[in-house]
Amino acid sequence: MKTVLIVLLRFYRYAISPMLGRNCRFHPSCSEYAIEAVQRHGAVRGAWLAARRVARCHPFHPGGYDPVP
């Protein structure tokens, strides 16, 4: 499951994200964060952390440096 999520995230990062432009307010970007979270914490907790991060990535949030816990 972990490998499948990482492959899907990398596909998004290299195939879809360049067409959308740099929109993430955080460093590392949301896709980089998601890959690292899944690698470090496993599929379930990593996906939960990534979903929480994407929910915070909007124009009204200041963004900034936000590493994977």
UniProtKB/Swiss-Prot annotation:
HAMAP family hit by this protein: UPF0161_YidD
Task: Extract the Pfam families matched here.
Answer: YidD
Which cellular component terms (GO) are annotated to the entry? plasma membrane
Question: What role does it play?
Answer: Could be involved in insertion of integral membrane proteins into the membrane.
What family is this? Belongs to the UPF0161 family.
Q: Does the keyword section mention Cell inner membrane?
A: yes
Tell me what topology the record assigns in the membrane: Peripheral membrane protein
**What keyword terms does UniProt attach to this protein?**
Cell inner membrane, Cell membrane, Membrane
Supply the PANTHER family for this chain.
Answer: MEMBRANE PROTEIN INSERTION EFFICIENCY FACTOR-RELATED (PTHR33383:SF1)
What's this protein's name?
A: Putative membrane protein insertion efficiency factor
Annotated InterPro entries? Membr_insert_effic_factor_YidD (IPR002696)
Asked if the record carries the keyword Signal, the reply is no
Location comes to:
Cell inner membrane
